[in-house]
């Protein structure tokens, strides 16, 4: 594999900085989209194995999820269609660091997709002196996904290796914990289930952009965020939210969707408009995070702006009751 396709980053620094490949390591392997509760259990197991083996713990993953390389072709009207990503790469790295992971080995999926499964363990050994692996029960690798978790564990079962760890299926709320189940919950308007499986609320973080200032004229000024390309957009509708601003944490009411009452364009771009309850400052150009806590109602088109104003007032009142202080 060409070195141009590879980067090692220390997670002990903020922001993460490039480092040389470690001489010895235990590696956690997976896509880790969303870094949900099962992922975090895997990462903690990797950190324990690495500490017992006297070496650093790293994560081997891709710049972009492998699913990105097998996309369905969108229809023309899907220019702003929802993606599948549950978090950004920077959010993913921060969550790795929270669990005590020392470094991440990022590579391009295209650089390894055709490597035979039998050659993959040697790639890990030569790449960073990998002496132990930790993965989930359903981990696949190698060309065509021919390699299994059991095969990888067998390849790292030499006496000189740190014992391999394969984590079994984790179940929660009557089902398997998985990124695909979290996506399904968000698309169906169930942020509570998504949060239970993730261990945190689904969120959107970004720089507030200027809108049409209609919310201000209605008496409910909003902070507007766009979903990055590839990011999963939850079910369109109104949410009770918790909003993290540079000036503190506030309850909020967020509309995710296309603003049908005021936007008559053929293919409007979905966004997130949040009325921050109890906040009176200016957030334009500042970074905020919106946690989606409770789905209140579907997005709808109102007959006039007075009806829209009344609905926002009701939504804000309900959100203020639901969003408790941290």
Tell where the protein language model's regions lie, with residue ranges.
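Positively charged, low-complexity intrinsically disordered leader regions
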Residues: 1-29
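ATP-dependent adenylation/pyrophosphate-handling site
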Residues: 22, 26-29, 47-74, 79-80
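Di-metal (Zn2+ and/or Mg2+/Mn2+) metal-binding site signature of metallo-dependent hydrolases
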Residues: 28-47
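Residue-level signal for inorganic ion chemistry
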Residues: 36, 96, 133, 194, ...
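Surface-exposed amphipathic alpha-helices with a cationic face
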Residues: 43-51, 153, 157
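N-terminal Rossmann-like or analogous alpha/beta NTP/dinucleotide-binding catalytic cores
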Residues: 65-159
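Glycine-rich, Lys/Arg-enriched anion-binding loops that position phosphate/diphosphate groups
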Residues: 157-258
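Phosphate/ribose-recognition catalytic cores of enzymes acting on nucleotide-derived substrates
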Residues: 211-326
């Amino acid at each position: 594999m060409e070195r141009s396709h590879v980067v090692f980053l220390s997670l002990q620094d903020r922001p993460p900085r490039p480092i040389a490949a470690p001489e010895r390591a235990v590696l956690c392997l997976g896509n880790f989209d969303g870094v949900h509760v099962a992922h975090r259990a895997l990462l903690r197991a990797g950190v324990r194995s690495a500490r017992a083996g006297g070496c650093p713990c790293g994560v081997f993953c891709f710049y972009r999820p492998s699913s990105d390389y097998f996309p369905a072709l969108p229809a023309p009207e899907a220019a702003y269609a929802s993606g599948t990503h549950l978090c950004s790469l920077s959010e993913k790295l921060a969550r790795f660091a929270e669990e005590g992971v020392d470094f991440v080995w990022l590579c391009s999926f295209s650089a390894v997709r055709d490597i035979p499964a039998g050659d993959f363990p040697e790639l890990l050994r030569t790449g960073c002196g990998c002496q132990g692996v930790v993965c989930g029960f359903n981990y696949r690798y190698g060309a065509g996904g021919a390699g299994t978790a059991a095969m990888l564990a067998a390849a790292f079962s030499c006496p000189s290796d740190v014992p391999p760890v394969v984590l079994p299926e984790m179940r929660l709320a009557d089902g398997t914990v998985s990124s695909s189940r979290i996506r399904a919950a968000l698309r169906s308007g169930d942020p509570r289930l998504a949060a239970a499986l993730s261990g945190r609320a689904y969120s959107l973080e970004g720089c507030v952009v200027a809108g049409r200032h209609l919310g201000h004229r209605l008496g409910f000024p909003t902070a507007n965020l766009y979903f990055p390309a590839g990011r999963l957009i939850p079910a369109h509708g109104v949410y009770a939210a918790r909003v993290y601003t540079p000036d503190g944490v506030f309850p909020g009411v967020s509309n995710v969707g296309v603003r049908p009452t005021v936007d008559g364009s053929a293919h409007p771009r979905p966004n997130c408009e949040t009325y921050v309850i109890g906040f009176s400052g200016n957030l334009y150009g500042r970074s905020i995070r919106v946690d989606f806590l409770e789905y209140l109602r579907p997005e709808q088109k109102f007959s006039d702006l007075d009806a829209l104003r009344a609905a926002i007032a009701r939504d804000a009142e309900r959100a203020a009751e639901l969003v408790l202080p941290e």
